[in-house]
Amino acid sequence: MIRTMLQGKLHRVKVTQADLHYEGSCAIDQDFLEAAGILEYEAIDIYNVDNGQRFSTYAIAAERGSRIISVNGAAARCACVGDKLIICSYVQMSDADARLHHPKVAYFEGENQLQRKAKAVPVQVA
């Protein structure tokens, strides 16, 4: 059996730019891509915390250290500057590998300051 697992996650990054006329994609600070193990041109899913929109695109690199999160092309209609996003990439693997797998999660606050990195999503409690 093949399972699709969370590979990398940027949690609560803030949109710094939305460019409807750029050819597509989501530009992400290279430091952020590395923190979550997301490659340039990799498929990503984006979840907009502010408006509930969920959409797919691909990652491109933005200048390292710029803290840029730019939603481009048609996807720019799904996010506004200042919106908080969760950006995820996924990987397919065998059931056996999935049971040993740990995603790369990067948590952000404020103006896209990386707060911490983790290899799991915390257990939700009541």
Swiss-Prot record:
Cofactor: binding details: Binds 1 pyruvoyl group covalently per subunit.
Post-translational modification: Is synthesized initially as an inactive proenzyme, which is activated by self-cleavage at a specific serine bond to produce a beta-subunit with a hydroxyl group at its C-terminus and an alpha-subunit with a pyruvoyl group at its N-terminus.
Pfam families linked to this entry: Asp_decarbox
Active-site residues (renumbered): S25 (schiff-base intermediate with substrate), Y58 (proton donor)
Keyword Lyase (UniProt): yes
Database matches in InterPro entries: Asp_de-COase-like_dom_sf, Asp_decarbox
Residues holding substrate: T57, G73, A74, A75
Methyltransferase as UniProt keyword: no
Keywords: Autocatalytic cleavage, Cytoplasm, Decarboxylase, Lyase, Pantothenate biosynthesis, Pyruvate, Schiff base, Zymogen
EC number: 4.1.1.11
Cellular-component GO terms for this entry: cytosol
Positions of modified residues (Pyruvic acid (Ser)): S25
Compartment annotation: Cytoplasm
Enzyme class: lyase
Quaternary assembly: Heterooctamer of four alpha and four beta subunits.
Main function: Catalyzes the pyruvoyl-dependent decarboxylation of aspartate to produce beta-alanine.
Family assignment from sequence similarity: Belongs to the PanD family.
Protein name: Aspartate 1-decarboxylase
Lineage: Bacteria, Pseudomonadati, Pseudomonadota, Gammaproteobacteria, Enterobacterales
Gene: panD
